[in-house]
Structure formats: C-alpha cells, structure tokens
Amino acid sequence: MSLSIPKIENGAAGDLEVSDKVFGQGFNESLVHQLVVGYLAAARSGTKAQKSRSDVSGGGKKPWKQKGSGHARAGTTRSPLWRTGGVTFAASNRNYRQKLNKKMYRAAVRSIFSELLRQGRLVVSDGIVPTSPKTRELAAKLKSFGEGYTVILAEQLDLNLALSSRNLPNVSINTADTLSPVDLVHAERVIATSSAIRKLEVRLS
C-alpha cells in the first residue's frame, strides 16, 4: 500500500507516491513527547556549578571557643551562614541526556511525519531550493505556501538554501540526516524535496 504527498512545482499540483510504512503510521503521542524531551535535554550543557561547604577553602579550625566570647557559636567559616561560606544546596555538573534507542527514535519520527501528512502540513517541492543565494527569491517562494513557521527539508545541506534562509524569520532548515523533532512538531508546514523524502523512506523503514 502507498500514500500520496501533495507536490507543488511552479504552481502545478501533483502527488508523490510514498510508503505507508513510513508516512502512514498512527500518532504515538507519548513516544513523540519522549523524543522531543530527550532532544531538548541533550542540548543542555549541564555545566552550572557552585561550591558547597565541602568545596570552599578554609574553615578547618573553629573560629572561636564555644562559650564566653559573646559571639554566636560557630564551628567553621565554611558554613552557608557565613559570607565566604559555601552554598547550602550547591548546583553541580550534570548530564541531562536521556536514553532513546534507534528503534524508538525511528518510530517517533515516522509518527511525526505521518501526522504531518494527515494534517496537510507536509508538501513536496523540489523548486524550493534556490539556485543562487537570494533571500528575496526564497521569500517569494515561501509566500506562495502561506505564512507561519516553515521547515524546509532537504536531502543534504545546500549552501544557497542556507544563505538564502538565514535572514528569514520563522524559517528553519533540516536535512534528512539531521532532523530536529522540535522544529517538525512546531512547524505550520514542512516543505520537503523529493530526494529528501526518498532518503527518509530508506532511513526510517
């Protein structure tokens, strides 16, 4: 069984036959959520660090005797109550990455693309890739598809496409090998090239 993705070239409408094994799957919300959360978590640096009372210098000696000095009792200058003391609940380096195996990743991406096709947010247009780095040319092409956040999906990174789109708001470039699930989920529409769709079929099947 095969499905059809709307294909628009120079104002003429057509269809691109695709496999339902990739673009005809049910929407698994929990799996897609796990993919998006894992993707965002992996982007966190996790390098925030503070010094606790065990990390700051000094404090090996009791500042003054327990009684008779008139001061409040103290056992160390590293106490969080002191100006030069450590932080009570100090932040430490942390790896935020979450495990998501290849089988789950592919299933989640298939689910996203299937839902995009069902909602009419996925179209194919080979002419979307400009032949020269002209922002005005790309903006005019995108305008014909409507307004809103748009993801352009190419088979591989194209220099003309990257240069033409970098100054356009609400436009993101993805390739078949470097997909951003966050971009795909938030996109009003995804405009893909035929070669990118074929590469996805091979990669996700």
Curated annotation (Swiss-Prot):
One of its GO terms (molecular function) is structural constituent of ribosome. Gene3D superfamilies: 3.40.1370.10. The keyword Zinc-finger does not apply. One of its GO terms (biological process) is translation. InterPro entries: Ribosomal_uL4, Ribosomal_uL4-like, Ribosomal_uL4_dom_sf. Keywords: Ribonucleoprotein, Ribosomal protein, RNA-binding, rRNA-binding. It holds the Pfam family Ribosomal_L4. Residues 48-79 are annotated as: Disordered. Belongs to the universal ribosomal protein uL4 family. HAMAP family: Ribosomal_uL4_B. One of the primary rRNA binding proteins, this protein initially binds near the 5'-end of the 23S rRNA. It is important during the early stages of 50S assembly. It makes multiple contacts with different domains of the 23S rRNA in the assembled 50S subunit and ribosome. Part of the 50S ribosomal subunit. This is Large ribosomal subunit protein uL4. It comes from Methylococcus capsulatus (strain ATCC 33009 / NCIMB 11132 / Bath).
